């Protein structure tokens, strides 16, 4: 792992940080003295899981996010939610935060559902990004979707500046 200027970053396991258990979330955040929650947990792959098992998609991407927002509000913590730019129709690319939303697939609908909870809480930031790894291994994901990718490591480099913002950033 590359070092960043960010300090005291924790990556808890599912066992120690259960997003379906409000008490588990609260205990962990208090114990570790967390000030900002970067919510990257999500059901994403395989993409067709969102069509085959809708309840899994709802639980992990909507209910889990709602639980995190509830606890962040209780503890007055900032939450940064990693959403997706798939919440846009995907016809033109380079979307602005104010462009109309029309999720491309069930995965995007589930991420938009999570966004709804996050937007209700004012001490929050939603990042609508499409992250991928280096080297870029997905020569194609969708043949009829225009999107902008960003590499994981580039998102991490931006966090020191992003944590000051609230609202939505593409």
Give, region by region, the residue ranges found by the protein language model.
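SDR active-site strand-loop-helix element
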Residues: 12, 37-41, 79-85, 89, ...
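Hydrophobic positions on the long internal alpha-helix
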Residues: 64, 68, 72, 117-118, ...
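Conserved Rossmann-fold NAD(P)-dependent oxidoreductase catalytic core, especially the SDR/UDP-sugar
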Residues: 66-102
